[in-house]
Each structure stands twice: as structure tokens, then as C-alpha cells.
Amino acid sequence: MADRLTQLQDTVNQQAEHFCNSIGILQQCSVPSKFAGFERTGSQTPQQQVHQQQQLPQQQQQQQQPQQQEDFPQLFSTLISRCAKDIDTLIESLPSEESSIELQVQSLQRLEAENKESAEKLEEIVRKGELLLEKIQAALSDIAQSQLDMQYSS
């Protein structure tokens, strides 16, 4: 599992993706608007522009039908708000600057105590394992000696 800073970075990147995707959907669903002084586009004549403007509402209706079925604004607002809550939670879980030295010292002391306890347990397990190994080797030696004695007596 990633540390808190990496989680925070991933969540901020995810939030940026949500913003970019929502802007893309807005651009895709938006209706063209007119600007004063820019009524003629490129090399189109006024008649071509009128014909294009008449076709535009039909195209918009065709494009908006499937998009109205899917509620993109609701989806992205939910995603963005959830992500913002996650970011807030991750930020709150980070250690504060004032108590970071004290917390680090306490944490290190606790870790050292746990490490010492684990080392003692490990040493005890190793000691028991070595005793068990000696017993097994002695038993195997006795078995081997017994087999040799049986072969020579036959």
C-alpha cells in the first residue's frame, strides 16, 4: 500500500482528470454562440452561413438526445465532490508540523521497543529450533546406527 503522500498525489491527479473530463463534456455538449463582428467564418458566403445555421439546430438535437439520457453533470459533480472529500481526509491524516518531531520520537521509541521484543522472540524461536534440530539429528543417528547393527548381525 502506498504512503499517504503518494495517495494524496494520486487523488489530486484523479481530481485533475475529473476536471479535464468534465470540461471536455461541457465542450462537447455546448451550443455554438455568436460573437459580434465574427459572423462570417473563413471563406463562407452569407448564403452558406444561413444554410449552415439552419442545419445546426437539427444536428444539436441529434447530439443532445443520447447525452441527455446520461446525466454527465450529475456524474462529474459527484466524482469531483467525492475526490475533494478524499483529498481533505488525506490532508487531515498527514502529521502536523508542530508535533512532528515529538511524534517521530515517540514513534521511533515504540518501533524500537517492538523491534527489541520481536528480536527476543526470534532468538527464543531460533534457540528452540536448534535444540529440536539436535534432537532430530541424534534420533537419526540412533536410527542409522540401529540399521547398521541389524545389517551386520544378520
Swiss-Prot record:
Stored Pfam families: Med21
Subunit-level organization: Component of the Mediator complex.
Recorded coiled-coil stretches: 96-140
Name the record gives this protein: Mediator of RNA polymerase II transcription subunit 21
Subcellular location(s) of the protein: Nucleus
Domain of life: Eukaryota
Stretches the record annotates as Disordered: 37-71
PANTHER family linked: MEDIATOR OF RNA POLYMERASE II TRANSCRIPTION SUBUNIT 21 (PTHR13381:SF0), RNA POLYMERASE II HOLOENZYME COMPONENT SRB7 (PTHR13381)
SUPFAM superfamilies: Mediator hinge subcomplex-like
Function: Component of the Mediator complex, a coactivator involved in the regulated transcription of nearly all RNA polymerase II-dependent genes. Mediator functions as a bridge to convey information from gene-specific regulatory proteins to the basal RNA polymerase II transcription machinery. Mediator is recruited to promoters by direct interactions with regulatory proteins and serves as a scaffold for the assembly of a functional preinitiation complex with RNA polymerase II and the general transcription factors.
InterPro entries per UniProt: Med7/Med21-like, Mediator_Med21
GO MF: transcription coregulator activity
Family: Belongs to the Mediator complex subunit 21 family.
A GO BP annotation: regulation of transcription by RNA polymerase II
GO cellular component: mediator complex
Keywords noted in UniProt: Activator, Coiled coil, Nucleus, Transcription, Transcription regulation
